[in-house]
């Protein structure tokens, strides 16, 4: 009916059931590509944001925390808020101290983290950036298990009760009560200044 220069979408899929939401998400993306009209899509659903956006703005209390492509924001979150919002399951956060280029937590250390900063930090590790290892840094006991076929979402505890999540391939057999030793995939973690919540690495 009209030929606007921009479309504004305000959570158009929020009241749909899961299957219809996926179908409509694909249809919106196809139509947008076909028509070539700039579109602004507001959503609280990070899957919608990641799959629909060419450029993504993560907003916290009216302030843009980060602007970039979905992959840039997933791989290089600039704050604890962004890191926790993008990614499902959510990134794991562990309190630590950075002292003389060594990251020190209650249960493990990470050496050779080159930084001029010394003080309290938060280490962020995505559940998919872990792998089983006899020489791993992180020990968890499986408390909850979500078996999705293609992968397993495994929940346990570290540091005397802090919840921790690990995503494993679906062909790995895991049972409740199993004890797992995990290592962080090389350099696949974030370090945030605890006072400012901003990224250090």
Task: Write out the residue ranges for each language-model feature.
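Generic secondary-structure boundary/loop-capping signal
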Residues: 10, 17-19, 44-47, 64, ...
């Amino acid at each position: 009916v009209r030929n606007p220069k921009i479309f504004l979408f305000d959570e158009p899929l929020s009241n749909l059931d899961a299957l219809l939401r996926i179908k409509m998400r694909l249809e919106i993306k196809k139509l947008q590509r076909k028509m070539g009209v700039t579109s602004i899509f507001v959503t609280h659903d990070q899957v919608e944001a990641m799959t629909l956006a060419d450029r993504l703005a993560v907003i916290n209390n009216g302030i843009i925390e980060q602007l970039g492509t979905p992959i840039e924001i997933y791989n290089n979150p600039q704050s604890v808020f962004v890191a926790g919002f993008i990614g499902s399951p959510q990134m794991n956060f562990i309190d630590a101290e950075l002292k003389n280029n060594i990251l020190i937590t209650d249960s493990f250390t990470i050496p050779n983290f080159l930084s001029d900063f010394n003080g309290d930090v938060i280490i962020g590790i995505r559940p998919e950036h872990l792998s089983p290892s006899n020489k791993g840094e992180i020990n968890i006991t499986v408390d909850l298990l979500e078996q999705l076929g293609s992968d397993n979402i495994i929940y346990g505890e570290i540091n005397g009760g802090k919840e921790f999540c690990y995503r494993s391939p679906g062909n790995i057999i895991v049972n409740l009560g199993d004890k797992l030793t995990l290592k962080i995939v090389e350099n696949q973690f974030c370090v945030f200044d605890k006072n400012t919540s901003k990224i250090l690495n």
